[in-house]
Each structure stands twice: as structure tokens, then as C-alpha cells.
Amino acid sequence: MQLRKLLLPGLLSVTLLSGCSLFSGEEDVVKMSPLPQVENQFTPTTVWSTSVGNGIGEFYSNLHPVMVDNVVYAADRAGVVKALNADDGKEIWSVNLGEKDGWFSRSSALLSGGVTVAGGHVYIGSEKAEVYALNTSDGTTAWQTKVAGEALSRPVVSDGIVLIHTSNGQLQALNQADGAIKWTVNLDMPSLSLRGESAPATAFGAAIVGGDNGRVSAVLMQQGQMIWQQRISQATGPTEIDRLSDVDTTPVVVNGVVYALAYNGNLTALDLRSGQIMWKRELGSVNDFIVDGDRIYLVDQNDRVLALTTDGGVTLWTQSDLLHRLLTSPVLYNGDLVVGDSEGYLHWINVDDGRFVAQQKVDSSGFLTEPTVADGKLLIQAKDGTVYAITR
């Protein structure tokens, strides 16, 4: 079993485990699969690359670049936020959200949740329980709000509200205009959970979010009223790790169906109105997944890449040659599925049969957060802070 991010009571750092021996007392060594040999059917091209601060190092993070109106916005853990020209990567503006700690130094802002761009603002959260709204024009701070806990997932903006899911199990709604807290919903917390939180999905005036308690919840966005809760993961098993029931992935809502995925639980389809389970499949992950047409694409907790049907979760294909390479969440780009890994490779996979179609060594520091796609470019940020724009 692979566990990448673990939150222990009183421990704020990220713990990387290669097995379960810490909890079971048994040696359980997990080895990374060797790099698969791939005959490239095309050569991906790096259009530009540029540094954004010092990156995230080995810390857990949800920071990844976002492109809006031909501008790329990216951040590092310490507090550097930059706007870049999407054509050539040149800097438009740069700010540092770290507090001054003397004449020539700043303390780290511990940015972790973001980046989200909407309505002329860049939204980003921190492990210091701060949420920032920056003006897209020049990076100046429009507002800054203290929230209930660490903001580890990206802010979600909808209907004039900024939704923040904090590390202590609180879902909070902030006024998009000034950051004032409108309401708080407690989603409950188990004694042990993975480090990270589900970013909410929004549909028909509701926020749908996963919790560390193994439940998916639907909440009215304007009132903060719970509509329904449904358990999709049960805390069972002989070890503490086996009993982790987190739903840290972002639910996907399509045609009145909520698709949700737990770490040790199930891939589950629920009715949006009632929360009733329509079907479930025994699969687990901490990576966000894709619903595209009648297919679901995901990376499971052992780094198998799978394609399944939206009707029942039937497996169409499985790619198992990247086991334990600590893959990013997948992204669809020009008809292929793309994932990054901890050694800095990008892997391009045929969506029809799961075969590799290309492989590219991009960065020596490796990747943790998922690529994003905009305006014909694939954007990805390495752990050392370098942002790459790639085309095929």
C-alpha cells in the first residue's frame, strides 16, 4: 500500500511512507516501477519555462498554474505569486505574500491551496489559515481573510461566494467582494486523516464536497444548509492506514450524477438531488479524476491508470507500468491522457487502449501537482517552482 501524505495529530509536516510498516509492524517495502520504455509517436515541445520562487520542495501542496486571458498565474510555497505572459513566459508582475521578517528577509507565507482565478482576482490559501484575493491587474491585495484552519485545497468561486475547505473539516463561504465569512459548516474529522482536503464542486446552487469522515456532502451555497450526506468509505481494516476513509478528491457532477472517489473506499456515483448511491466500484485514490463523455479516467492509490465507464464503473483498460511512481492527477490534452511523476517525467497515454504514445523528461525535481490545459498548451509546475508550457 502506498501513502503519500499523512496528517498525524500534532504533526504539521508531510510524511512520506513507502509502506505500512509504521502501523502494522511488518516490513512492507514498495518499490517504484522502472521507467517504461516508450517509442514516442510524437515529440512534445517545451515552448517556454520560467521559475516561480523556490517551489514547494517535498511539502504537500495543491499549487498549480492557471491560465486566464492569455496570462498564467502561479505561486510558490514561500509566498511568491507571479503573472506570466502565456506566449513566452515573461513576467507581467510579481508579489510576495510572506510577511517582512527584518530588513532583508520575509517569513514564509506557507501557500498551499490554489491557484484560482475568477472575476478579476487571484485566490489562494495558506497553511497559516489565510485566504488572499489579489487583483489580476497588478497583484495587489484586494482582501485577506483568516479562515477556520489550513486552506490546503484550492478556493472555489461560484455565485459570488468563495468556498474554502479547511484542514480541520470546516467548509466556509466567503463573500467574493470583501472576503467576509458568510457561513461555516462542520464536516467532522476523524482522529487520523490524510493531509489534504477535497475542493468542492458546484452545481445548481449547491456545493458538493468530500470529507475526511468518508462522506460526501451537499450544502446550499447561499445559506450554508446541509442538503444531504452520504458515506462512500467505511473505516475498516487491521491497521490505522487501512482505516483511513478520506474523500480528498474533488467530486465531479455530470448530468445530475455526482462521481466521488475515496482513498480507501469506493468510486461512487450518487444522485445529485438525493445523494442516494447509484453504483459503486472498489477503487481508491487521492488524485482528482476526469469524467469525459461516457468515460472516467483516474489514477488509483497504487498509481495504476484506469479508464472506466460512467455506467457502472466497468474497467475498459488498465495501465500498470507506472506503479508507485507517485503520479499526478491526469489531464486530457489533444486526445491523450497525460500524467506527471515524481522523477519529472510526463507520460502520454492513448485514451482508447491505455498504451503509451510518448514520454518526456521535463524536470529533475519532479512533479507533485497536476498539469492544466488552456489555449492549446499544457502547463505544469515542478517541485522546484519551474513552470513549463508544453505543446505536442
Curated annotation (Swiss-Prot):
GO terms for biological process: Gram-negative-bacterium-type cell outer membrane assembly; protein insertion into membrane. Keywords: Cell outer membrane, Lipoprotein, Membrane, Palmitate, Signal. Its main location: membrane. A lipid is attached at C20 (N-palmitoyl cysteine). It is a lipid-anchor. The keyword Signal applies. Pfam families: PQQ_2. GO terms for cellular component: cell outer membrane. It comes from the Bacteria. PROSITE patterns: PROKAR_LIPOPROTEIN (PS51257). A lipid is attached at C20 (S-diacylglycerol cysteine). Residues 1-19 form the signal peptide. It is found in: Cell outer membrane. Belongs to the BamB family. Part of the Bam complex, which is composed of the outer membrane protein BamA, and four lipoproteins BamB, BamC, BamD and BamE. Part of the outer membrane protein assembly complex, which is involved in assembly and insertion of beta-barrel proteins into the outer membrane. PANTHER family: CELL SURFACE PROTEIN (PTHR34512), OUTER MEMBRANE PROTEIN ASSEMBLY FACTOR BAMB (PTHR34512:SF30). This is Outer membrane protein assembly factor BamB.
